[in-house]
Amino acid sequence: MKITREQVEHVARLARLELSEAELDTFTGQMDSILSYVEKLNALDTEGIVPTSHAVPMENAFRADEATGSIGVEAALANAPLRAQSFFRVPKVIE
């Protein structure tokens, strides 16, 4: 499957990218190379090959989740420049 310059322009528009003429030429060639490689991979006989979801065995390296005590509301808000009841008050950032 050969990718066309028009297809690269279409993908760039979808991604909201503005590409120069040189970039369009470069990316057309690069995407064509990638698709050629994928076609080679698709042609391989993978019958009887077990799918691999992870190359190495997965282990949970994190500790067990245990509840512990924490500081109180007043201590947490002690240095807050603005507060509203028992919450931090921050400037409005979205209109």
Swiss-Prot record:
GO molecular function: asparaginyl-tRNA synthase (glutamine-hydrolyzing) activity; ATP binding; glutaminyl-tRNA synthase (glutamine-hydrolyzing) activity
Protein name: Aspartyl/glutamyl-tRNA(Asn/Gln) amidotransferase subunit C
Catalytic activity: L-glutamyl-tRNA(Gln) + L-glutamine + ATP + H2O = L-glutaminyl-tRNA(Gln) + L-glutamate + ADP + phosphate + H(+); L-aspartyl-tRNA(Asn) + L-glutamine + ATP + H2O = L-asparaginyl-tRNA(Asn) + L-glutamate + ADP + phosphate + 2 H(+)
Alphabetical GO biological process terms: glutaminyl-tRNAGln biosynthesis via transamidation; regulation of translational fidelity; translation
Organism listed in the record: Citrifermentans bemidjiense (strain ATCC BAA-1014 / DSM 16622 / JCM 12645 / Bem) (Geobacter bemidjiensis)
EC numbers: 6.3.5.-
Pfam families per record: GatC
Annotated SUPFAM superfamilies: Glu-tRNAGln amidotransferase C subunit
